[in-house]
């Protein structure tokens, strides 16, 4: 995993697409996937340097708020390596199976 993980959770896909587009245009970050949380909530993940991820999530939250509802924005600096297993880059979706496997590995 890179130096930081950024997440934006919105209500609805339109706001999430706006957020993701703005994040990728605002800073040198990599799209790491997305995950539906249920009840219309969806979360996008980006990775990169701490400053770039912070700038990207700020821009993404602002863009999403113009067209919908931003539920949460979070930047994790230097996330634990096991967290990388949660994001499945082959599908572009967060992998709950991989997250469960990482959790079991620690036991």
Residue ranges of model-derived segments:
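Long, contiguous binding/interaction regions
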Residues: 1-40, 47-107
């Amino acid at each position: 995993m890179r130096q930081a993980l950024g997440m934006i959770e919105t209500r609805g896909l339109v706001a999430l697409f706006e957020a993701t587009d703005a994040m990728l245009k605002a800073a040198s970050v990599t799209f790491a996937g997305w995950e539906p949380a249920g009840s219309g909530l969806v979360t996008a993940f980006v990775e990169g340097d701490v400053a770039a991820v912070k700038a990207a999530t700020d821009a993404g939250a602002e863009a999403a708020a113009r067209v919908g509802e931003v539920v949460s924005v979070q930047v994790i600096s230097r996330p634990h390596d096991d967290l990388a297993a949660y994001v499945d880059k082959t599908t572009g979706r967060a992998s709950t199976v991989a997250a469960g496997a990482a959790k079991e590995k620690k036991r």
